[in-house]
């Protein structure tokens, strides 16, 4: 029997962080193959239609994209199911708007507007560093980029600052204690803090202890940590909440205080 790639995705099987309601249809957009995994990405159609409300349906999204108005990391994208992901910069030429895809404290992609100056670069986590053919050194980033002849000081888990116009590495941050990080997986997804301690476990996962702005400490796996800045200073602007997770009672008190001011 002939088999092939799956071309459909049921709405109930779509990732929770897309925030699609179950009763609006049977199917959800199936992400195209691309730089981010299907469970960790946000298709362009979901971003433009469901988040920004720039379109009412898929046909309108395709009409916008075919006018070549939308850029992802400085490149025009016309595929409505193109998988955008963490740290990607989405630009809308006609309105002059720029967005960076980052997580909120509940682990969902948030609509985070940035300036035109900040849209010129993105941060990439180094996943692999090795020698290629004829001894040419190269590194591979979290979004599938291969960069040849990097700085020899750059190691795995470091973060590079990539210029989107020249595709050159401008600078890099070492993965070390006191570096500022954002958690990109697990139950603490979206939280921002400073690395306090690193636990080494042979044959198992390395554990990173992080302390947030309220001096609350939590732990996560090494693979879930993305360095976003040096001691006390982030290289990107952070969304509302600044990556600080509040307890249920603190959120309740905050809502009541805001309601009292209104």
UniProtKB/Swiss-Prot annotation:
Subunit composition and interactions: Component of the small ribosomal subunit (SSU). Mature yeast ribosomes consist of a small (40S) and a large (60S) subunit. The 40S small subunit contains 1 molecule of ribosomal RNA (18S rRNA) and at least 33 different proteins. The large 60S subunit contains 3 rRNA molecules (25S, 5.8S and 5S rRNA) and at least 46 different proteins.
Protein name as annotated: Small ribosomal subunit protein eS4C
Residue stretches making up the S4 RNA-binding domain: 42-105
Gene Ontology terms: biological process: cytoplasmic translation; translation
Taxonomic lineage: Eukaryota, Fungi, Dikarya, Ascomycota, Taphrinomycotina
Keywords from the UniProt entry: Cytoplasm, Phosphoprotein, Ribonucleoprotein, Ribosomal protein, RNA-binding, rRNA-binding
PROSITE patterns referenced in this protein's UniProt entry, alphabetically: RIBOSOMAL_S4E, S4
One Pfam match: Ribosomal_S4e
Other noteworthy facts: There are 3 genes for eS4 in S.pombe.
Entry-annotated residues carrying Phosphothreonine: 194
GO molecular function term, any single one: RNA binding
Highest taxon listed in the record's lineage: Eukaryota
Known role: Component of the ribosome, a large ribonucleoprotein complex responsible for the synthesis of proteins in the cell. The small ribosomal subunit (SSU) binds messenger RNAs (mRNAs) and translates the encoded message by selecting cognate aminoacyl-transfer RNA (tRNA) molecules. The large subunit (LSU) contains the ribosomal catalytic site termed the peptidyl transferase center (PTC), which catalyzes the formation of peptide bonds, thereby polymerizing the amino acids delivered by tRNAs into a polypeptide chain.
Entry's localization field: Cytoplasm
Originating species: Schizosaccharomyces pombe (strain 972 / ATCC 24843) (Fission yeast)
GO cellular component: cytosol; cytosolic small ribosomal subunit
Family: Belongs to the eukaryotic ribosomal protein eS4 family.
